[in-house]
Amino acid sequence: MTLSPEKQHVRPRDAADNDPVAVARGLAEKWRATAVERDRAGGSATAEREDLRASGLLSLLVPREYGGWGADWPTAIEVVREIAAADGSLGHLFGYHLTNAPMIELIGSQEQEEHLYTQIAQNNWWTGNASSENNSHVLDWKVRATPTEDGGYVLNGTKHFCSGAKGSDLLFVFGVVQDDSPQQGAIIAAAIPTSRAGVTPNDDWAAIGMRQTDSGSTDFHNVKVEPDEVLGAPNAFVLAFIQSERGSLFAPIAQLIFANVYLGIAHGALDAAREYTRTQARPWTPAGIQQATEDPYTIRSYGEFTIALQGADAAAREAAHLLQTVWDKGDALTPEDRGELMVKVSGVKALATNAALNISSGVFEVIGARGTHPRYGFDRFWRNVRTHSLHDPVSYKIADVGKHTLNGQYPIPGFTS
């Protein structure tokens, strides 16, 4: 195959022999010390991304026969949550990396799977995505893919919200075949080197949260896509959605990862608030107590936070195990399998979103006015959850669950459902 980015990053030989969750916790402990400062600065988390590269975790889901960790989905989800607890931006970046790589297996060929998985594992490649566009609606894609005589394409246009594209080695991109081609209107997917001539990830990401995710735009100017870099036939993803084939698992995978990013952030907010309440919060004088930790209303709040997380965590872990069961069915996947998984994941997404938003804003009630000082950075938890939770309206996830409960309907397969 032609896809061989110039950057080579040799993977630690014994990485896959370690416990990935323990590795993630070690990294999280290191990053937690600089999270507030880095959030304030914004920009790129270059050093932290290199930490992840050196850890070998970028090949977490790569099968062992290709040199990866060979982790299952429940383990991968746990790693995402650990990272997000320390830094929402890094949890976001790593989560997106985990949604990108499975596309190789979901719609690519056996040859592409072997080649790309091996390269990711051996060279510790970061993957980035270039799918969304900032047009009239979410699927109004204008990046054009012009077919070439050799079976490849040439891409032109601009993608937006390209999380992780900057600093990545392998870029997953979608384009629409131009109107004067026999394939007109078809959506093509490809995995290309980010260093390919004509690919320009831009430094134009600006939002109230997720400030170190490099989620800005990426320009494509006469970018050549080689024939063996095209994943599946034109409209492979669309057909997978229509027929509830294995490729349609992209949506529940992505949504479950997003939910666990939120849960990780909620855990991070709760842990940080608890430490502050124990060590710095002042008791309310009329309460007649000596320590803030004795306040009955504060105690109740921490109980409510914890209970909300217990329920959401349990649902998320149950969904991760169901994902593994469905994933293992391979091509024997049925529409019912896919539908049951998506309903479960939709419920988790709603639980996680509500818990994370409530906890990340509610912690201010238990830390008090002094805790709002910027040096503590408590606001970053809410800003991160609020920013990413707008990715797709959670109300539609709740409606999907309701339609199934009331009418036995499964969500219509798509990029977010």
UniProtKB/Swiss-Prot annotation:
Query: In terms of temperature, how does the activity behave?
Result: Optimum temperature is 40 degrees Celsius.
Pfam families, per database record = Acyl-CoA_dh_2, Acyl-CoA_dh_M, Acyl-CoA_dh_N
Q: Does the keyword Nucleotide-binding apply?
A: yes
Which catalysed reactions does the entry list for this protein?
dibenzothiophene + 2 FMNH2 + 2 O2 = dibenzothiophene 5,5-dioxide + 2 FMN + 2 H2O + 2 H(+); dibenzothiophene + FMNH2 + O2 = dibenzothiophene 5-oxide + FMN + H2O + H(+); dibenzothiophene 5-oxide + FMNH2 + O2 = dibenzothiophene 5,5-dioxide + FMN + H2O + H(+)
Annotated region Lid loop: where?
131-142
What the record says about activity regulation is: DBT degradation completely inhibited by Cu(2+), Mn(2+), p-chloromercuribenzoic acid, 2,2-bipyridyl, 1,10-phenanthroline, and strongly inhibited by Zn(2+), 5,5'- Dithiobis(2-nitrobenzoic acid) and 8-quinolinol.
Q: Which residues bind FMN?
A: 96, 129-134, 159-163, 282, 369-370, 391
Query: What does the record give as EC number?
Result: 1.14.14.21
Annotated stretches, region: Helical N-terminus: 18-124
Region Helical C-terminus, as annotated, extends over: 234-417
Pathway it works in: Sulfur metabolism; dibenzothiophene degradation
Which Gene3D superfamilies does the protein's record reference?
Acyl-CoA dehydrogenase/oxidase, N-terminal domain (1.10.540.10), Butyryl-CoA Dehydrogenase, subunit A, domain 2 (2.40.110.10), Butyryl-CoA Dehydrogenase, subunit A, domain 3 (1.20.140.10)
Task: Name any one GO molecular function.
Answer: flavin adenine dinucleotide binding
EC class (word): oxidoreductase
Gene Ontology BP term (one): L-leucine catabolic process
Q: How does activity depend on pH?
A: Optimum pH is 8.0.
Q: Which domain of life is it from?
A: Bacteria
Key words of the record: Cytoplasm, Flavoprotein, FMN, Monooxygenase, Nucleotide-binding, Oxidoreductase
What is the annotated localization of this protein?
Cytoplasm
Function text: Catalyzes the first step of the '4S' desulfurization pathway that removes covalently bound sulfur from dibenzothiophene (DBT) without breaking carbon-carbon bonds. Sulfur dioxygenase which converts DBT to DBT-sulfone (DBTO2 or DBT 5,5-dioxide) in a stepwise manner. Also acts on thioxanthen-9-one and 4,6-dimethyl DBT and 2,8-dimethyl DBT.
The remark listed among the other comments is:
Reduced flavin is provided by flavin reductase DszD.
UniProt similarity note: Belongs to the DszC flavin monooxygenase family.
What subunit structure does UniProt give? Homotetramer formed by a dimer of dimers; FMN binds between monomers of the homodimer.
Tell me the protein's name.
Dibenzothiophene monooxygenase
Q: Which organism is it from?
A: Rhodococcus erythropolis (Arthrobacter picolinophilus)
